[in-house]
């Protein structure tokens, strides 16, 4: 079985997280298993379901500049304890630079950056996020995006593959009983 480490901020019920769960619920989990590295110390909405589907959830330090020394220490230990991960797939846009850098240093052969945004929030990490955006191509060896604009934004070129977001269409089929309510 192949285990893929999905890197996210958390697994609360939001757009990216729900899309990942749609994929996860529908893959052949006998052949491929998703595990999740989150950046929140507390349990998220989907954690119990992930475990029930055979996945694992790891809690890394938050990606705040003051936590970077602790983050790098955590990730160095994480990769030393988990050599089973040969594929890491990061969904945290320009911040993917940090986990993918540590994965590269640890010798993880497949490092995927996945762009889901077309801009960077102008928060206190704005300058760092811009710098990380310029470094992402040096640490990721596969580039994915949910759309062309998101890909061009993060990678600053056309060297990426577009994977449209997964939507469970059955949730949106007409249902007379639901309409009656």
What are these regions (language model features)?
Residues 90-96, 115:
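Short His-centered aromatic/hydrophobic patch
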């Amino acid at each position: 079985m192949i285990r893929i480490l999905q890197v996210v901020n958390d697994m609360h019920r939001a757009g990216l997280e729900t899309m990942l769960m749609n994929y996860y619920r529908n893959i052949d989990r006998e052949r491929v298993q998703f595990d999740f590295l989150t950046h929140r110390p507390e349990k998220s909405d989907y954690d119990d379901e992930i475990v029930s589907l055979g996945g694992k959830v790891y809690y890394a330090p938050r990606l705040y500049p003051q936590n970077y020394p602790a983050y790098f220490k955590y990730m160095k230990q994480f990769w030393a304890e988990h050599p089973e991960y040969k594929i890491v797939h990061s969904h945290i846009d320009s911040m993917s630079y940090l986990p993918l850098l540590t994965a590269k240093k640890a010798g993880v052969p497949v490092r995927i950056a996945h762009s889901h945004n077309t801009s960077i929030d102008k928060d206190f990490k704005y300058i760092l996020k811009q710098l990380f955006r310029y470094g992402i191509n040096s640490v990721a060896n596969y580039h994915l995006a949910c759309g062309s604009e998101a890909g061009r934004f993060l990678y600053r070129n056309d060297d990426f593959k577009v994977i449209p977001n997964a939507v469970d269409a059955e949730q949106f089929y007409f249902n007379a009983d639901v309409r009656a309510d």
